[in-house]
């Protein structure tokens, strides 16, 4: 966490020559202890469950928080908020990728995505509009979704959730299905659904490494906060790192 904190301190706030963006008065959380945090957690998301090992890793992490005096509660956001945020990311991503491309290039881009990163993906709207009006409508939806997430965080400081279906996986060709615990997962569904939603809403998140799993592969959790909670996330990560394994280098695979 100290390395991340250093990077964040360098990057945070507007450039000194930017006169249009006011500086944020960041809250300083140094005096907070684990007992000052109220933490929500989920073992997975609707339509995107996780492996048994991932659930166990999350539960073990929550127990660490409890043991240090933290307040925890399992609570999934209402109204399919995760699903709608994920759909927003999909539409905004496509609009960003396709903007300003000649009309004859767009089908080639779609074909490349279908045969690569998004191979086998379901519920993808391949035909979409990319006018300024459509973009403005999406931004309006994004503002509403951000509001709903912020309402959720009114009752909690942080949210602990999965960072993927299972542990880190062996490097493979993009689009190759990944099998873990006897279940084969589409390449896009192994990590994307658990992280992209917060990229869409813009909520700060941090990945906390928790050592190695039963196969000797890295495991961890994702912790998300409300807007402007970066100092709290970093402070929480430093507190909890004293009671977890943290990053452990795994043995390299034979070539």
Describe each model-derived feature in a short phrase.
Residues 1-56, 244-255:
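A short helix-breaking turn/cap at a secondary-structure junction
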Residues 148-151, 186-208:
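Small-aliphatic-rich amphipathic alpha-helix that forms the alpha element of a beta-alpha
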Residues 52-77, 105-111, 135-156:
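Acyltransferase
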Residues 1-11, 200, 204-211, 215-220:
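Short glycine/serine-rich loop segments
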Residues 19-25, 139-147, 187-188:
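Short gly/ser/thr-rich secondary-structure transition/capping motifs
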Residues 217-226, 233-234:
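Short, well-ordered beta-strand elements
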Residues 169-191:
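Short, surface-exposed loop/helix-turn segments at secondary-structure junctions
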Residues 33-42, 91-150, 162-167, 171, ...:
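Short helix-loop capping/hinge segments that flank enzyme active sites or metal/cofactor-binding pockets
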């Amino acid at each position: 966490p100290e390395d991340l904190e250093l990077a964040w301190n360098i990057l945070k706030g507007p450039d000194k020559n930017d006169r249009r963006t006011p500086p944020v008065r960041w809250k300083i959380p140094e005096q907070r202890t684990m007992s000052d945090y109220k933490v929500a957690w989920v073992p997975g998301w609707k339509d995107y469950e996780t492996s048994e090992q991932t659930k166990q890793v999350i539960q073990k992490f929550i127990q660490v928080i409890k043991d240090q005096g933290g307040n925890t509660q399992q609570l999934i956001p209402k109204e399919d908020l995760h699903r709608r945020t994920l759909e927003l990311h999909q539409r905004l991503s496509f609009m960003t990728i396709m903007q300003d491309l000649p009309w004859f290039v767009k089908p080639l881009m779609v074909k490349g995505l279908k045969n690569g990163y998004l191979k086998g993906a379901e519920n993808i709207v391949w035909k979409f509009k990319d006018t300024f009006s459509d973009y403005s409508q999406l931004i309006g939806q994004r503002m509403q979704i951000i509001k709903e997430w912020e309402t959720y965080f009114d009752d909690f400081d942080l949210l602990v959730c999965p960072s993927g279906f299972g542990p880190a996986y062996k490097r493979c060709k993009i689009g190759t299905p990944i099998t873990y615990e006897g279940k084969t997962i589409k390449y896009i569904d192994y990590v994307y659904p658990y992280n992209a939603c917060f990229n869409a809403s813009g909520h700060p998140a941090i990945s906390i490494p928790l050592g190695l799993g039963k196969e000797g592969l890295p495991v961890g959790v994702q912790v998300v906060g409300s807007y402007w909670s970066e100092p709290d996330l970093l402070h929480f990560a430093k507190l909890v790192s004293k009671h977890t394994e943290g990053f452990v280098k795994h043995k390299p695979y034979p070539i």
